């Protein structure tokens, strides 16, 4: 009996000695086998894992979604589904605008700025601002061209707002839709390394139109040479952005098909800019005061009455 007591006393003494020598050691309570091991405060072994838990969150489902790289998406008929397309901050919008104004050769706008997070906030407000910039600048240009003419009566043309809205929004949505369908069709025949979603294409087209906002404001200057220089600069910047963005998506295709696709994209973009300049600025409608001319019968009647 004494030998057993001595053995138990020696184990307790060894444990106490070990804890004294290494206070950070892991201890387990024998009376509660279901309890998990406890670490002493200040243990460096668990600090890294705790920091990861703080970054990823304590919810296991959130960790699984983050590790899988996927988020739960709401049904398309709910408000939350469309809210994700406007989930961008001011820095992201300004960064994408800056990227559209300064396209870098060899850099992909989608991979560099959008990064699989396309938004509709920027394209929507860029198109809305461009609509009013074109309509208001067109009316002011018409007014300045005929300023000082006694026979000219200025009448604001509010219908230019609706016409500009139809043109801009149709271009910003229908052209990307057609391009997306074409790229999907070609990808079924030729496997391309780079592929874009419909929202990514809409996002690229929306931000590519930002350069036309200051251009439309400067179109107020009643000089055709200045206007055409401005439109060529804007077309060169935005057109190069579109060409450099969509060339990787068709590069693996047939050479003629790839070149024809890029040329078509640039030509449609040119048609938009030149068409807006020609319709809203270069062809102002004349609205003179009505003038009356005396007919021979009226002259004879006036002479008889006198």
UniProtKB/Swiss-Prot annotation:
GO biological process terms on file: vesicle-mediated transport
Any GO molecular function: small GTPase binding
Lumenal side, ranges: 141-162, 222-227, 278-306
Matches recorded under InterPro entries: Yip1_dom (IPR006977), Yip5/YIPF1/YIPF2 (IPR039765)
Residues bearing carbohydrate: 297
UniProt topological domain (Cytoplasmic) ranges: 1-119, 184-200, 249-256
Compositionally biased intervals (Acidic residues): 50-59
Residue stretches spanning the membrane: 120-140, 163-183, 201-221, 228-248, 257-277
Entry membrane topology: Multi-pass membrane protein
Taxonomic superkingdom: Eukaryota
Region (Disordered): 14-62
Keywords assigned by UniProt, alphabetized: Endosome, Glycoprotein, Golgi apparatus, Membrane, Transmembrane, Transmembrane helix
Compartment annotation: Golgi apparatus, cis-Golgi network membrane; Golgi apparatus, trans-Golgi network membrane; Late endosome membrane
UniProt biased composition (Polar residues): 15-29
GO cellular component, one term: Golgi apparatus
Pfam families per the UniProt record, alphabetical: Yip1 (PF04893)
Subunit structure: Interacts with YIPF6; this interaction may stabilize YIPF1. May also form a ternary complex with YIPF2 and YIPF6.
PANTHER family: PROTEIN YIPF (PTHR12822), PROTEIN YIPF1 (PTHR12822:SF4)
Annotated family: Belongs to the YIP1 family.
Protein name from the UniProt record: Protein YIPF1
């Amino acid at each position: 009996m004494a030998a057993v007591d001595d053995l138990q006393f020696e184990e307790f003494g060894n444990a106490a000695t070990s804890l004294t020598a290494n206070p950070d050691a892991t201890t387990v309570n024998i009376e509660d086998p279901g309890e998990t091991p406890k670490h002493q405060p200040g243990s460096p072994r668990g600090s890294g894992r705790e920091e990861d838990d703080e970054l990823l969150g304590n919810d296991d489902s959130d960790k699984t979604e983050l590790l899988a790289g996927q988020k739960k998406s709401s049904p398309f008929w709910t408000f939350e589904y469309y809210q994700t397309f406007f989930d961008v901050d001011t820095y992201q919008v300004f960064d994408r605008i800056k990227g559209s104004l300064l396209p870098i050769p060899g850099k992909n706008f989608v991979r560099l700025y959008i990064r699989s997070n396309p938004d509709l906030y920027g394209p929507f407000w860029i198109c809305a601002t461009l609509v009013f910039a074109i309509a208001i600048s067109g009316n002011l240009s018409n007014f300045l061209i005929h300023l000082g003419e006694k026979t000219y009566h200025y009448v604001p043309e509010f219908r230019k707002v609706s016409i500009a809205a139809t043109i801009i929004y149709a271009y910003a949505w229908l052209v990307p839709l057609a391009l997306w369908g074409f790229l999907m069709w070609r990808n079924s025949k030729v496997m391309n390394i780079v592929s874009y979603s419909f929202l990514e294409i809409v996002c690229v087209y929306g931000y590519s139109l930002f350069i036309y906002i200051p251009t439309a404001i400067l179109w107020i200057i009643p000089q055709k040479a200045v206007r055409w220089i401005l439109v060529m600069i804007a077309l060169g910047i935005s057109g190069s952005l579109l060409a450099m963005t969509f060339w990787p998506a068709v590069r693996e295709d047939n050479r003629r098909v790839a070149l024809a696709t890029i040329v078509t994209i640039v030509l449609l973009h040119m048609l938009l800019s030149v068409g807006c300049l020609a319709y809203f600025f270069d062809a102002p409608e004349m609205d003179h005061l009505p003038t009356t001319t005396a007919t021979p019968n009226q002259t004879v009647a006036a002479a008889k009455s006198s």
